[in-house]
């Protein structure tokens, strides 16, 4: 898939060609929330939220959640799941994430990243980092799973662990950065869990 437009992502959701959307929360986030490293509750943005599985996990854990996705079908699916579960502490909005900076500047305690950084054109990664910095509150945190596979092409576009650090460490402090050991089978060895905090 070389077309990364909103229409292309929408078509993939409409045709069911969305293997990144597991239909259940990713195990590393489930286990993080039950660990001693679990973040305190707050307002969290989920970028590229897809069908909302990870967003709903955090809502059920007491977070106030706003999920954003390029594709309206993904947003409709996420809203339906929230309604089915009776969750009202969550909102899903169809947006281009790069349009969020003005409306949501300093708007979130946390940002949740799972399959967004790997889905955008790698040339936009510096802009993504600046977006995250802008919409987080002072000392806000990015909670992320990054794809570190070495395969060419994408999406998902991989990134070496040091590349990820090089993008974020000029503006963020590293709280946690480690290989994921509880990935689903097809992602084993290809993921890093990170928590980066906006530097004072």
Q: Model-flagged regions — what are they?
A:
Residues 2-45, 50-104, 120-200:
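Class I (Rossmann-like) S-adenosyl-L-methionine-dependent methyltransferase catalytic domain
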Residues 109:
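Conserved acidic residues
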Residues 112:
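A conserved beta-strand element that flanks and buttresses the S-adenosyl-L-methionine
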Residues 115, 119:
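Short catalytic micro-motifs in class I SAM-dependent methyltransferases
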């Amino acid at each position: 898939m070389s077309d990364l437009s909103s229409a292309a992502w929408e078509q993939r959701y409409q045709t069911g060609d969305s293997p990144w959307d597991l239909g259940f929360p990713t195990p590393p986030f489930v286990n993080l929330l039950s660990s001693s490293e679990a973040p305190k509750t707050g307002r969290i943005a989920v970028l590229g939220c897809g069908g909302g599985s990870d967003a709903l996990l955090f809502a059920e854990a007491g977070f106030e959640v706003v999920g954003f996705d390029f594709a309206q079908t993904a947003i409709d699916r996420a809203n339906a799941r929230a309604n089915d579960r009776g969750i009202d502490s969550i909102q899903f909005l169809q947006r281009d994430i790069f349009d969020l900076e003005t409306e949501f500047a300093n708007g979130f305690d946390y940002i949740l990243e799972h399959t967004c950084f790997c889905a955008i054109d790698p040339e936009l990664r510096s802009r993504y980092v600046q977006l995250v910095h802008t919409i987080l509150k002072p000392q806000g945190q990015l909670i992320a799973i990054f794809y570190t596979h070495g395969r060419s092409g994408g999406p998902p576009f991989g990134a070496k662990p040091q590349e990820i650090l090089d993008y974020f460490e000029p503006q963020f402090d590293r709280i946690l950065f480690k290989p994921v050991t509880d990935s689903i089978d097809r992602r084993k060895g290809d993921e890093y869990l990170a928590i980066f905090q906006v530097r004072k």
